């Protein structure tokens, strides 16, 4: 398997940002880490090994990004607006710096996939919904898609609202976005077992919104034995990859 340990300077975040590449060909899969995780986490917890057959066949190549969650949504000493503004800086890094860097490394200029587990699933779905011109496939595993989970009630703060998928999706009526959502491949999965309860309300609210807006998506509920844990994500990711058009 082709592996590269990479880094580049981010002007938006004013620091060196680290990322790893796994694979030599195929659609680019941008991976967001779980809560406070690093660019090494996806490999360390066996997700790359779980998807090895897809990588070695040249069907996908993974790029695992660094996180700034500890300075944004997990920075509980900040007020909600400042948490959201740090996330916005990270968004600018991803879209304006990381994605061009990855494209330059690979020569891939078609639509990308994004994925993540737990908080990474929140990022994956949020980035897809905000940038469906960049990401045309998403696999979100065990996420919480409501910004209130991180900041509490936020009233009319637009910076938070614009990063709370269960809220802004209801008011997304722009045909440019809706058309791209309808053309995309979307998987949102949750288990019903231990530690999955936090994500269930937003999972069902999202499903309702997608249904009402006639956006095709696979909202997959796995069983009551399926916990919020890497053991299950290692099973889910290759399963869903096997059902997407790669």
Where are these regions (language model features)?
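Non-catalytic cap/lid and distal C-terminal segments of serine-dependent acyl enzymes
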Residues: 1-246
């Amino acid at each position: 398997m082709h592996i590269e340990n990479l880094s580049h300077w981010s002007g938006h975040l004013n620091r060196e940002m680290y990322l790893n590449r796994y694979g030599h060909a195929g659609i680019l899969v941008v991976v967001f880490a779980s809560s406070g995780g690093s660019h090494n986490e996806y490999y360390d917890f066996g997700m790359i090994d779980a998807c090895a057959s897809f990588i070695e066949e040249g069907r996908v190549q993974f790029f695992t990004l660094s996180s700034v969650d500890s300075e944004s949504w997990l920075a509980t000493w900040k007020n909600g607006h400042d948490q959201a503004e740090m996330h916005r800086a990270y968004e600018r890094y991803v879209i304006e710096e990381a994605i061009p860097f990855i494209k330059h490394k690979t020569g891939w200029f078609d639509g990308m996939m994004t994925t993540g587990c737990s908080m990474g699933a929140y990022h994956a779905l949020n980035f897809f919904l905000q940038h469906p011109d960049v990401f045309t496939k998403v696999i979100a595993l065990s996420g919480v898609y409501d910004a209130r989970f991180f900041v509490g009630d936020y009233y009319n703060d637009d910076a938070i609202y614009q990063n709370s998928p269960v809220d802004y999706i209801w008011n997304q009526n722009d045909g440019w976005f809706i058309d791209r959502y309808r053309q995309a491949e979307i998987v949102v999965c949750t288990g019903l077992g231990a530690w999955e309860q936090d994500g269930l309300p937003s999972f069902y609210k999202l499903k309702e919104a997608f249904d009402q807006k006639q956006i095709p998506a696979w909202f997959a509920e796995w069983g009551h034995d399926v916990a919020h844990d890497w053991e299950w994500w290692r099973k889910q990711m290759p399963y869903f990859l096997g059902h997407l058009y790669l």
